[in-house]
Structures are given as structure tokens and as C-alpha cells.
Amino acid sequence: VYKRQVEYGLKPFTTDGKEISESDLVRQKKMDNKFGGGVFSLNYTNHRLTASLGGGINQYRGNNFGKVTWVKNYIGALSPAHEYYRNQSKKTDGNIYLKASYDLTGGLSAYADLQYRHIDYTIDGANDKYDWNKSALRLLAVDKKFDFFNPKVGLNWNINSNHRVYASFSVAQK
């Protein structure tokens, strides 16, 4: 597939008196991603109450980039690792929760599950799409923070070993 060289940061070249502005080329798109995190929980139980406090945090870091490795009949200086785009992203996601179940009577119990979640998301750099109106690669500039509260409450009624009824109310966001 012929591509316009300007899309890849390459200048047109002249061969046999003719300017060549598009050509066959080979490109590589690569990612260098890292992910890590951790979780914890503390649990408590007595004869009527079961509770858990926990949470976690994780982080993703991504470097995305593209290289032009070969251009058909290209006369200009082409580095073996000519990069035509690069961007970096980072997403940090942390949460904490408290959940509990309390036995009200012989078969009726109440429960609550409360979660707070925070997300921090950034992207910076250029993507691989060329903007012909701006004569440049499209730039990415994202710096967003999100906070969510996800409550859940309800009742469980164990009628017998074969039948159970429950009612709950919850709000979920991601």
C-alpha cells in the first residue's frame, strides 16, 4: 500500500527528475507496557457479624511508538529506527471497601458493601493518525481524575435450605 511520506515524518525525494511523495514502506508499531499493583483485606467474624475491610491499587504505564524500517527507493537519510510517533500513558486505579453482614434473627441478615474508587489517567504525545488540516500527527493530551462511590445495602432471608429471598439497593460506577 502506498503511503504519503509526510505522514511518517519523511520528506519527499526526487528520482529521475520526478518528486516522489508517496511510496511503499514497512512500519512497526510497538508497545512497551508495564503493570503492577497490590491488594489487601482484613477480616473479622463473630457469631452475628462478618466484616471485611480491603482495597487495592494498581498502575499501568504504556509507551506506544511506531517506526519506519524501510521505504521503497528512498533516497533521503533514513535511520534504521526512524520513529514517526510516540505517546505515553499512565493509569493509576485505587480503591478501598468495607463490607459487613449482620445476622438480625434466625434467618434474616442485613448487609452493606461500601466502595470508594479513584482513577488518575494521563496520556501525552502523538498518535499514529495524521491530521491533514494541521499538517501534523494528532496530539494526545489527557489528564483526567475520576472518583466513584459505590454503595450496596440489602437484606437476605433464608426461608429454609432450599429457598432464599433477598432485596438490595446499589449504585455502580466505573
What residues fall within each predicted segment?
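Short, small-residue-biased leader/transition segments that mark boundaries at the very start
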Residues: 1-2
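Flexible, solvent-exposed coil segments and beta strand-coil junctions
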Residues: 10-24, 70-81, 124-136
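Long amphipathic N-terminal alpha/beta scaffold segment
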Residues: 21, 37-39
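Flexible loop and strand-edge segments within Gram-negative outer membrane beta-barrel domains
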Residues: 27-34
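A structural preference for short, pocket-lining loop segments at secondary-structure junctions
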Residues: 50-52
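Structural signature of Gram-negative outer-membrane beta-barrels, strongest in the C-terminal barrel
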Residues: 56-58, 82-174
